[in-house]
Amino acid sequence: MIRFDRIAKRYPPDITALADISTEILAGELVTIIGHSGAGKSTLLKLIPAIERPTAGTVLVNGQNVGSLGRGALPFLRRNIGLVFQDQKLLFDRSALANVLLPLEITGFPHKEAQRRAEAALDKVGLLSRARALPIALSGGEQQRLAIARAVVHRPNLLLADEPTAYLDADTAQDVANIFIEFHRVGVTVMVATYDDRLFPGARQLRLDHGRIS
């Protein structure tokens, strides 16, 4: 499903984020990316939906070289990818339901179908009863679950998450981790950058150290 072939990523003036990364992620896998702060975890994830482009090497998603895609082709790549990053970018002046509806509205989904999908996504993460609440009224764990619901509302086959349990207490972190595990169990390919691999028992671990697989 995903193949990294001799990937390097450098930032000016002379910062190496990733160096000579070659690995493959199979469809349906649950993979955790482990490493200290600055190890390159976030950068590696951002290469997959072409948020970042590699300095060298090739990233293939379903056989497609994402680094060569033009701006017009990116929406077609990203519609099959769910993204959950540390900066959730929730709209705090809109309800939980409205936040989840937004990706479907942007892509022109019929309203009734969009409403049904958004409510189903909220239900999957245990937030349907809070559908009318503003994000400011939600706890940190609930806000993270809301971000997950928004990421999966378009039913992607690949789910990427960057430290989704950061700043959460132990019990809440495990609750959030379990949501990703459940999506993996129904066939979604899941990649999670995490500081605590114990939250994802049974996951294949990809360890990064100073931008290299260790």
Description of each model-found segment:
Residues 57-65:
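Conserved ABC transporter NBD signature motif
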Residues 1-4, 9-20, 70:
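A short, flexible loop at the N-terminus of ABC-type nucleotide-binding domains that lies
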Residues 12, 66-82, 111, 185:
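ABC ATPase NBD coupling module
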Residues 134-138, 142:
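Conserved ABC ATPase signature
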Residues 49:
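Helix-to-loop junction immediately C-terminal to a conserved catalytic motif
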